[in-house]
Amino acid sequence: MKLFTRLLEWGAVGAMALATTALAQKEQWLDYHVSREGRGYHYLTLTTNPPPNIKLPKCNSQPYFAQWTTPMDPAGRWLCLDRTRKSGLYDRVYFDTTGNGRLDDKTPVGTTQRDQYSASFEPVRVVFKGEDGPITYHLIFRFMQYGEGEANLMSSSGGYYAGKVDIGGKKRPVELIDENVNGTFNDRAADMSDCDGVAIDGDKFGERRLGKMLEVDGQFYLVEVARDGAFIKLQKAENVTLGQVRVPEAISEFVAFGENGHFTRKPAKGEFTLPVGEYRIQSWKIDRKDARGAAWVLSAYGFNDSAQFEVAVGKPASLEIGEPMRAALQIEKPMAGPDMRVPTNQLGFNLRFEGRYGESLQIMKGDQRPPGPRLTLTSLDGTYRYTNTFEFG
């Protein structure tokens, strides 16, 4: 593991004025933990074609193969899915744990739970070569196949780092999570889905994705994480330049992610501040009570690329989010047959509520979903009438 000693480089010139304190940060070491509850997820591409130059095990049936890619090993790691019987669900996996290019010398890993359509596997121990010795990591796989449909394999991180970290003079439990499941814990990117995560105990905003900074109890900290997750460095960020953001006054919570980090805001009369820089809207909420005092929440997620915005000094960013919302009705004709190419005599109706940036909207009454909208179909001459209720799914 290579210890970080260089000063953090900053992207936009003049975006923020920070004291040169990164070199003063000290490593705060964390412990590695293994869990059967996977963190993050990433789908692997399955193929029935054997990988070249990989020695394979003797299988009981036609196997599936997949390659897991990781910055920790440029060659990646291959795996083989097999059955304990000649037919049925795939329920054991051979994985190149050591990176020696062989699967025939590996012991297969079995399942922790399974049903008719899926199987979850025991954590697979992976070993990387590090500068200071071997580095251990764990992967969790879940195989899914519904009937004769397409087979899918999902990978999750089965290991994480945790420990007590000094944040502003107070020791707080911290966890580092490999959210993009590539074997490293320090990934930062413009797209939040490509970033790793950090969770701070007692933090009301929960897990955040990694950026240049973390905000804890209203204070900004420069953050640096070891590639293998073994330590974290935090340094109070001084003289952070902020810019104004405006949203409709009905917005009760707003979440954005950008080069600077992952931030949650509770707007006051539709206004709040963020460190200057580029961001993307991640979510928003509207809280409201009806005439009977029942609490309702309208929340948004899954924004398109138009949800990007810039925070600058002296130029407030105005975001048109919130109400009104749009109802989009999609009608499809399901297909059938072995190759799913035979038209049926049925129609499928899908109702989706969305916002201005293509975001999906969800409505909750307390902790429950309200009854779904009703759909009524009537023929032009009125001789046919059909009524049904949409279900969440």
Regions found by a protein language model. Give the residues of each.
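Bacterial N-terminal signal peptides that target proteins for export
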Residues: 1-12
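Hydrophobic h-region of N-terminal signal peptides that target proteins for export
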Residues: 13-23
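Calcium-binding acidic motifs and repeat modules
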Residues: 24-260, 266-380, 386-393
